[in-house]
Amino acid sequence: DKILVAISGGKDSLCMLHFLKEFQKKALIDFEILAVNVDQKQPGFPTEILPKLFKEWNVPYEIVEQDTYRAVAEKTLPGKSYCSLCSRLRRGTLYDSARNFGCNKIALGHHREDVLETFMMNLFFSGQLGSMTAHYQIQAEGLQVIRPLFSVYEDWIADFVQAQGWPIIACNLCGSQEYLKRREMKELLNQLQE
């Protein structure tokens, strides 16, 4: 297997890359990893951080430049979140990149709370019972998508990454986060867990 590890620069994707790299050293199966960051040309994105980190970690990497930010900004209505369209465009770029770089798997950094929040969003906003899965096939592309952190608590990831002192790139660069429905679901889940 050759796994494209999707790296945003956030805590989840960096934690995932670290553990895949550690697993690679001990695994009884042979696999390659390729860290890929999609540079969507968001204003203020610190482009120097990830290449430096990948070199320090001795991880093969590619930075794929795809100016989706402008398209998302133009097509998103005022008061709405960029996240859904931005995510779809980034995912398409990751699929293309996997093909171009000869990868048969894509690793995404979604964790337990992402799964629960997606379930709640589907329930409240679509009337459907469903969430993301730990892995799935994209038959037409010949790809498998995996989520190695699927059952890992977000707090555990945050604590681990903070203890490592890694540079984290915030996910609020585009300025549309205040309208995020996912934030509402996160707050609801926090209330339910108390």
Question: Residue locations for each model-derived region?
Answer:
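Catalytic subdomain that performs nucleotidyl-dependent activation
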Residues: I106, E113-Q193
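ATP-dependent adenylation/nucleotidyltransferase module used to activate substrates
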Residues: D1-F119, F125, D155-A163
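Short, basic, helix/turn surface patches
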Residues: C86-A98, H135-E141, L192-E194
